[in-house]
Amino acid sequence: MAYAAFRSIGAYVPSKILSNEDLSKMVDTTDEWITKRTGIKERHIAADGEFTSDMGAKAAQIAIERSGIEKNKIDMIVCATISPDYFCMPSTATIISTKLGLENVTAFDISAACTGFVYILSIAKAFIESGMKKNVLIIGAEKLSSITDYTDRGTCILFGDGAGAAIISATDDKSEAIIDIHTGADGEFADLLMSPNGGSGSIHDTLDQEAKSCFMQMKGNETFKVAVKTLTKDVIEILQDNNIESSEIKHFVPHQANLRIIKAVGDALKLNDEQVVLTVEKFGNTSGASIPMAINDIYESGKLKAGELMLLDAFGGGLTWGSALVPFSPLK
């Protein structure tokens, strides 16, 4: 039987920084107000003319180079994004495939908001274990600045741009394998986080209303309560299902939405500060890109070593959620 191994990680962060001080000149807010409520100090913003596919391709190129796997051996690309280059078609994954010079690969996008990376990790695992694919490139890429209302202080303080990518490949060695992935969704809470843009559910009569509805909308307090409850329940279940103690987790890599949410879940699991990966302060919430960007951060800082166990955990619009137990298994 083939198993799926997490081989490499890469990320791309735009150079432009939007600080809390910058935002205080745009909306009624302060650095203190933002930091106290979110833990965010700054976020990165894509340059004019820089698209989601550009960022995704740059992150992917790094992941490919680090993997030790020949580029032409990649047989599938899956991109998680809620800010694609084009909302209808083509998919961002197909555009990325061309930018990477890859031909005849399966390529498609999925939309699971901030849980996107866990979802595409589960897709890669399933395709590899079925024997249908051998080397899958998964990408979380977001240009959230393109769907952020910079007159709404409740959302514009949260979001940033960036991309992260990983190579998942087949292995015969079970010790290298992704251990387990949980995913779920509940549409009952769909209105907590949404971007009611021009889909078939649109009810707007004018183009101005339609354009405004493309921006992300969030019910912050309700989302916080549901997120903490759902994330805590999910990570406890995946640990119990696999007879793994929280002390065995080397790196807890949650979706970087809000420092208070992350700390609440970490406290529920009795994790120490060294186990919890935090990048929300410098990147903000980058939705489907946040987990791979956080993994890349600990990789580049030398904290992530071969064989170490990561617990990934995410929650997003839909509502969606997911968790994964993932050993870091670079090719020897």
UniProtKB/Swiss-Prot annotation:
Keywords: Acyltransferase, Cytoplasm, Fatty acid biosynthesis, Fatty acid metabolism, Lipid biosynthesis, Lipid metabolism, Multifunctional enzyme, Transferase
Active site, UniProt feature: 114, 255, 285
One GO CC term on file: cytoplasm
CDD domains, A to Z: KAS_III (cd00830)
Major place of residence: cytoplasm
GO biological process: fatty acid biosynthetic process; secondary metabolite biosynthetic process
Cellular localization per UniProt: Cytoplasm
Pathway assigned to this chain's UniProt record: Lipid metabolism; fatty acid biosynthesis
Region (ACP-binding): 256-260
EC number: 2.3.1.180
Nuclease in keyword set: no
Catalytic activity: malonyl-[ACP] + acetyl-CoA + H(+) = 3-oxobutanoyl-[ACP] + CO2 + CoA
GO molecular function, one term: 3-oxoacyl-[acyl-carrier-protein] synthase activity
Record's comment describing the protein's domains: The last Arg residue of the ACP-binding site is essential for the weak association between ACP/AcpP and FabH.
NCBIfam families with a match to the protein in the record: fabH, PRK09352.1
Biological role stated in the UniProt entry: Catalyzes the condensation reaction of fatty acid synthesis by the addition to an acyl acceptor of two carbons from malonyl-ACP. Catalyzes the first condensation reaction which initiates fatty acid synthesis and may therefore play a role in governing the total rate of fatty acid production. Possesses both acetoacetyl-ACP synthase and acetyl transacylase activities. Its substrate specificity determines the biosynthesis of branched-chain and/or straight-chain of fatty acids.
Family: Belongs to the thiolase-like superfamily. FabH family.
Assembly, per entry: Homodimer.
HAMAP family: FabH (MF_01815)
UniProt name for this protein: Beta-ketoacyl-[acyl-carrier-protein] synthase III
